[in-house]
């Protein structure tokens, strides 16, 4: 029999070419024996968990692949008996393999989104634990001294602070996580379930992200105190939309600075006016109201 093997795309640009391949297989081959030699044939950074389905993307599941093929249904039946014409690798990015295996072994396909969120939460907790441990071994910190002072002045508190990671709580109880790598800084909020929601992404990494963070902390600080919102500063940075992403950009000293926001233009428009200000200016704007 001829069996078409396909898989989901795993990243942007991965869908520019077809992943399909067609194999000639003796019909008396059992499903278990056939699948034992199959892989998605793609390298994925981090957790790479797949649900293996008969037919297409919406076909019946028969097992999973996480570096090891696990056939959990119909393993002893032949391809001819099952009428197999296709195998699809359904990509479950971030899903913990052990939880997926536990559910499938019990005969249940779990909700994909819920399992992925659990995987991300576990990963974020590991990141937080590592940052806490790192902070105990070094005096280097992600946020500038000015941003640390702003957090305190605006009713917040820093709970974990390491060289590339900071978790803090604002005056209204909202938890924020700020991270940085060699290319970008990222600011996220964390909900009660432990899920992160991206607030903005910034380049170059460093103080640029602090402008949005401190402006957000300032706005919530005033709201908790029953104060009127401040008038945004006159330093305007143009907001535009490209490729489904709302952003602002400006060039300073020959270096392009950029802030990206999701899911719409509301956040980009709200925080663009602060992008060219220094953190102490933003703090003063919200606490004193005299920075222009």
Question: Locations of the language-model features?
Answer:
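Intrinsically disordered, low-complexity, charge-dense segments enriched in Lys/Arg
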Residues: 78-83, 90-96, 101-124, 128, ...
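Short aromatic-glycine-(Arg/Gly/Cys) micro-motifs in beta-strand/loop hairpins
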Residues: 1, 171-198
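Long, charged/polar, surface-exposed segments that mediate recognition or autoinhibition
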Residues: 197-227
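An exposed acidic His-Trp-rich patch
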Residues: 49-70, 218-243
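Short gly/acidic/polar-rich coil/turn motifs that serve as flexible hinges in modular proteins
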Residues: 27-29
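Ubiquitin system architectures
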Residues: 5-23, 32-130
């Amino acid at each position: 029999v001829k069996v078409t093997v396909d898989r989901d795309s795993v990243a942007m640009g991965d869908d520019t070419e077809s992943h399909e391949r067609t194999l000639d297989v003796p019909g008396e081959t059992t499903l278990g024996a056939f699948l034992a030699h199959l892989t998605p044939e793609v390298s994925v950074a981090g957790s790479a968990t797949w649900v293996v389905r008969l037919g297409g993307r919406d076909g019946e599941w028969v097992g999973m692949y996480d570096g090891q093929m696990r056939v959990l249904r119909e393993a002893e039946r032949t391809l001819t008996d099952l009428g197999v014409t296709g195998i699809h690798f359904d990509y479950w990015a971030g899903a913990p393999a052990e939880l997926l295996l536990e559910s499938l072994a019990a005969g249940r396909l779990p909700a994909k989104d819920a399992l992925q969120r659990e995987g991300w939460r576990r990963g974020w907790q590991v990141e937080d634990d590592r940052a806490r441990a790192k902070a105990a071994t070094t005096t280097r910190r992600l946020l500038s001294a000015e941003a640390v002072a702003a957090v305190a002045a605006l009713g917040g508190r820093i709970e974990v602070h390491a060289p590339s990671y900071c978790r803090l709580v604002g005056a209204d109880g909202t938890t924020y996580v700020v991270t940085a790598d060699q290319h970008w800084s990222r600011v996220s909020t964390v909900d009660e379930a432990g899920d992160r929601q991206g607030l903005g992404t910034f380049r170059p990494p460093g103080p640029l992200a602090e402008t949005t963070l401190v402006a957000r902390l300032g706005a919530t600080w005033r709201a908790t105190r029953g104060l009127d919102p401040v008038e945004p500063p006159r330093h305007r940075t143009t907001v535009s939309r490209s490729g489904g992403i709302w952003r602002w950009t400006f060039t300073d000293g020959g270096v392009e600075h950029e802030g990206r926001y999701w899911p719409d233009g509301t956040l980009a428009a709200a925080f663009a006016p602060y992008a060219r200000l220094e953190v102490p200016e933003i703090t003063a704007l919200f606490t004193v109201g005299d920075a222009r």
